[in-house]
Amino acid sequence: MANELTWHDVLAEEKQQPYFLNTLQTVASERQSGVTIYPPQKDVFNAFRFTELGDVKVVILGQDPYHGPGQAHGLAFSVRPGIATPPSLLNMYKELENTIPGFTRPNHGYLESWARQGVLLLNTVLTVRAGQAHSHASLGWETFTDKVISLINQHREGVVFLLWGSHAQKKGAIIDXQRHHVLKAPHPSPLSAHRGFFGCNHFVLANQWLEQRGETPIDWMPVLPAES
């Protein structure tokens, strides 16, 4: 069955491509020269570690990792326990409070429990220099994450893609909307959330789609590992 394929199966060849090796080398060289890069090396590929290809039900595309101390840990929009919840994620929580009965905003921004349920929290660029947004945007990560999206499109069926903002929507242009469920809205950033992210109902619609397919819906209440 297709959904038994792993990321290793489908990405092993891509990871040998010269552009990808160059990307890794550039990041490694910057780290070795004393530049602070987020997330830490061990966390760069956490999106794939926590959500195996065969388990992907929902894809949420981010853009850049957070560039503040201790924030980024390899999952889009998520921050480590003990770190203040960033504004875009607070707006996601606000939308959840307004649309999911019983949802109460957690006091943390750690989304591993989403990832463990099949929500691929994928940034389109996987590293960033401290304090410098988009500083690694041209290193080759976009090529790699384009490939990831095309592989999900090809090997999975019925995945919900939540595309927030123009960057994610351009990135998701290759998705076959006959084969997958594509939902679009403005970005949850405070700059754009009031233009239609609030009220988009995406978290509810994603679960309705999954239930129609006979799949377990996502429990959108983020739970810290010690609580689960």
From Swiss-Prot:
Subunit description: Monomer.
Catalytic activity of the protein: Hydrolyzes single-stranded DNA or mismatched double-stranded DNA and polynucleotides, releasing free uracil
Similarity annotation: Belongs to the uracil-DNA glycosylase (UDG) superfamily. UNG family.
A GO MF label: uracil DNA N-glycosylase activity
Major enzyme class: hydrolase
NCBIfam families: PRK05254.1-1, PRK05254.1-2, PRK05254.1-4, PRK05254.1-5, ung
Keywords: Cytoplasm, DNA damage, DNA repair, Hydrolase
Localization per record: Cytoplasm
Protein's UniProt name: Uracil-DNA glycosylase
Domain of life: Bacteria
EC code: 3.2.2.27
Gene giving rise to this polypeptide: ung
GO BP terms in the entry: base-excision repair, AP site formation via deaminated base removal
General function of this protein: Excises uracil residues from the DNA which can arise as a result of misincorporation of dUMP residues by DNA polymerase or due to deamination of cytosine.
Species whose genome carries this gene: Escherichia coli O6:H1 (strain CFT073 / ATCC 700928 / UPEC)
Keyword flag Transmembrane: no
A cellular component annotation (GO) from this entry: cytoplasm
Predominant location category: cytoplasm
Pfam families tied to this protein: UDG
Active site residues per record: 64 (proton acceptor)
InterPro entries membership: UDG_fam1 (IPR002043), Ura-DNA_Glyclase_AS (IPR018085), Uracil-DNA_glycosylase-like (IPR005122), Uracil-DNA_glycosylase-like_sf (IPR036895)
PROSITE patterns: U_DNA_GLYCOSYLASE (PS00130)
